Amino acid sequence: MTQEEEYILIGKVLGVWGINGGLKIEVLTDFPERFDAGNELLIGRAPYTISQTSWQKAQVIVHLSEITGIDAAEELSGAQVEIPAAALKKLPKGVYYDFQLIGLEVTDLSGNRIGQIKEILHMPSNDIYVSSYGAKEALIPAVKDVVKEINLQKGQVIIDPIPGLLD
């Protein structure tokens, strides 16, 4: 595991909230309870403890035990909010974190290389894997009829492309 993989991005500090040093954070995790009071997180790779939390739509306002004023809070503006990879929740079999899939090689059933997953779009009906495909992109629906196998150890996603998918 590389140093970058040892830390998982869960948010980004958008700015300061109030004069007491609260931070407005864009939430980038499916587990918003990570921002509950009492939890620890890393901002700029330094550890902080959440003392108070309030929600504002898809953003969270956190107050940190170690930050008591606006000046100290402003220094964290724009910083990444992370957790150690060891703190990741175990997912059910067949369910993956986005960071585990991004960068995987996509091949068809015959072993022909299609590209590499660059992004994952979370849609209401199913996720879509955005893969490089020559000079274009392929939008691969993450459904059982198309995605036949995901093998993290081999770094590979095997698909059975539906007609028109790669045109």
UniProtKB/Swiss-Prot annotation:
GO cellular component terms given for this protein: cytoplasm; ribosome
Per the record, the GO terms for biological process are: ribosomal small subunit biogenesis; rRNA processing
Signal peptide annotation: none
> What InterPro entries has UniProt attached to this entry?
Leu-rich_rpt, PRC_barrel-like_sf, PRC_RimM, RimM, RimM_N, RimM_N_sf, Transl_B-barrel_sf
One Pfam family per UniProt: PRC_RimM
What is the annotated localization of this protein? Answer: Cytoplasm
Q: Which domain of life is it from?
A: Bacteria
One molecular function GO term is: ribosome binding
Q: What sequence ranges are listed for the domain PRC barrel?
A: 93-165
Does the record carry Cytoplasm as a key word? yes
Statement: the UniProt record of this protein carries the keyword rRNA processing: yes
**Which keywords appear in this protein's UniProt record, sorted alphabetically?**
Chaperone, Cytoplasm, Ribosome biogenesis, rRNA processing
NCBIfam families (alphabetical): 16S_RimM
Instruction: Please state what the annotation says regarding this protein's domains.
Output: The PRC barrel domain binds ribosomal protein uS19.
Entry similarity comment: Belongs to the RimM family.
Role description: An accessory protein needed during the final step in the assembly of 30S ribosomal subunit, possibly for assembly of the head region. Essential for efficient processing of 16S rRNA. May be needed both before and after RbfA during the maturation of 16S rRNA. It has affinity for free ribosomal 30S subunits but not for 70S ribosomes.
What is its quaternary makeup? Answer: Binds ribosomal protein uS19.
Which HAMAP family does the UniProt entry name for this protein? Ribosome_mat_RimM
- Protein name per its UniProtKB record: Ribosome maturation factor RimM
Whose protein is this, by species? Dehalococcoides mccartyi (strain ATCC BAA-2266 / KCTC 15142 / 195)
